[in-house]
Amino acid sequence: DAILLSPFENSGGYGRIEKLDIPIIECADYMETSALGRAEWMRFYGLLFGVAPQADSLFAEVDSCYQRLKMRAQLSSTSFSVVSELKSGSAWYVPGGRSTIGRLFQDACGRYAFADDTHSGSVPLAFETVFDKAGDADVWLVKYNRDRDMTYADLEADYIGYTGFKAFKTRNVYGCNTAKVPFYEETPFRPDYLLSDLIQILHPE
């Protein structure tokens, strides 16, 4: 038996769980900075559960599909600029330029507004900072969790400042309702699915 846990910096340990005398396996896949690096953790889980050959085969398929899509994006003659996420409270958490999502934008050959950022995680910024840098982005990608799909009226009602974005005005906002779509469950192990979607959005030709 073992307990699989995601480690967090400065967490001070695992409290009472450490006293159960059951081995703890730290699964740090979410800390990877490339989509394929994160997906490759399926090989570790394959070893753990005795299905290594199947896991290796699946990762090889994911890797092959991802590389093929990446090459296709490089052949595109057009590329949209992109900004992502929504304001949460007083901060807008944008993916760092070296984060998994930031590098996915790069592999999709999109012009990410914060591509020059050096963080590997999310970066909390003021709304004004995001608007100044990404207000003219061609495409805006948002994730949310709601009972029903968001509309432009919902975005405006949530925060009037959203209406100033070019992508809002041109109706070029793409949303993923994580209450209906298994985004967080699927994309860590099938980043090629997400890359394919990004390429279709950022290279409409």
Model-identified regions with their sequence ranges:
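Alpha-helical segments with a strong preference for the paired helices of cellulosomal dockerin domains
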Residues: 1, 15-19, 151-154, 161
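Local beta-strand N-terminus motif with an aromatic residue
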Residues: 1-2, 137
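Short, surface-exposed alpha-helical segments at coil->helix boundaries
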Residues: 11-14, 39, 94-102, 159
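Short, structured coil segments at secondary-structure junctions
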Residues: 20-21, 108-109, 169
